[in-house]
Amino acid sequence: MKQWYEELFENSADNYENEEFTKGTIGEVDFFEKEAGYDKSLKILDIGCGTGRHAIELASRGYRVTGIDLSESQLEKARKNATSRNLDISFFRKDARDFNFNGEFDLAIMICEGAFPLMETDEMNFHILQNAFNSLNDRGKLIFTTLNGLFPLFHSFATFDHLTFRNITTYEMTDDSGNKKVLNCNERYYVPSEITWLLSSIGFKKVTICGCQLGAFSRDEALTSENFEMLVVAEK
């Protein structure tokens, strides 16, 4: 039986590219470039790459990029998008809980909950962070966004479980073929101290957590309870 996040991204690549959160790609890649020191020799891994919006923008700026995603329909769209722009990007169908690149990359990105923190258990989410860590070389860096657990504590979420920090909701959607779906979504929210502990226990030496603004990622943005997402930069 498919999980809700598999159903969410199945046959929905066209709709995905029209979502509001995809409008911030340019500004977000500007931040990645700054974090990469504008070094075009770096190898970058895009985990949960979807239709390739970040990977393609990075490749267009001269970076070597690999994208992985669980959804073949999303990857098919990503490959078409890259081909239309004559860009050489490797896209692979891989589960973020089970991949191994063993120190091949200088930078890994994981944006807009493309993988973490959508999994059924905390252990699965942890495995994603472990795999991201293992994919990086000794001076590697991981940049990702995740759901801010402070937000539902200060806002009214009738569906939020304060014991598990999971928000369980029903979501109605229409796929690219016009088929309607009703999904039972289950997303894990994290507070900053959890993220810091998880990443430190894996082996990251420095963890920076900031507020997250669509298309305007910045280390100068302080995280507050008004931020729906947090931006995390973890360095080996």
Predicted regions and their residues:
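C-terminal lobe and adjacent flexible extensions of AdoMet/dcAdoMet transferase-like proteins
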Residues: E194, L198-K236
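Class I SAM-dependent methyltransferase SAM/SAH-binding core
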Residues: A55-D98
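SAM-dependent methyltransferase
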Residues: R139, I143-L198
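A short acidic, Gly/Pro-enriched loop at the edge of an enzyme's catalytic core
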Residues: R97-L107
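Conserved class I S-adenosyl-L-methionine
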Residues: M1-G50
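A short glycine-rich, Lys/Arg-flanked "PGG" loop and its adjoining helix->strand segment in the class I
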Residues: M124-D138
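A short SAM/SAH-binding and catalytic strip from SAM-dependent methyltransferases
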Residues: D106-M124
